[in-house]
Amino acid sequence: MGELVKNFSDNCIKLTEHFEGAVLHKYDDGVGKITIGIGHMVKPGEIFPEKITYEFAKELLMKDLQIAKNAILKNVRVPLNQHQFDALGVFIFNVGTNAFAGSTLLKKLNAGDFDGASKEFIRWNKGRVKGVLSEMPGLTRRRVAEQKLFNSNPSLNNPLKFIIA
């Protein structure tokens, strides 16, 4: 294993933005959560203007990814390659730090079962729509992409060209 990975590469940022999109005004994310920018969930007390700039959306994304990064550094007990670190960042950005901390994905990862951990991504493809837990095609595509990034050969510099072609 090479140098210990402690930060995201552009692959994490690009894949997150690919699935979140950049919406420069508040909107409902499809499961009832008010969101703005590049998937930033508006928290109680946060106030935003009617419209934000792309640059501000990117700042929010970087702050949110910092939270995901901290969750990886706090919870993962095994060395990760860059693609694994990035894939977990995209995943945690979407599911949240608490869900990740209690996940079977993390348990398998920390047990050294990288293959088993990889197979857990797809189990997170559901959301509550009108109170009913339903498979969401967009989440399925996202989880497959996260899994592919997680499993990408560490020597591959630009795995996204094969993942989101």
PLM regions and their residue ranges:
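Short, residue-level hotspots on alpha-helical faces of the histone-fold
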Residues: K63, V90-V95
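Long, amphipathic alpha-helical surface segments
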Residues: M1-V31, H40-I47, I52-L65, K69, ...
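Short alpha-helical scaffolding segments that buttress acidic/His motifs in well-ordered protein cores
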Residues: T16, Q84-I92, E120-I122
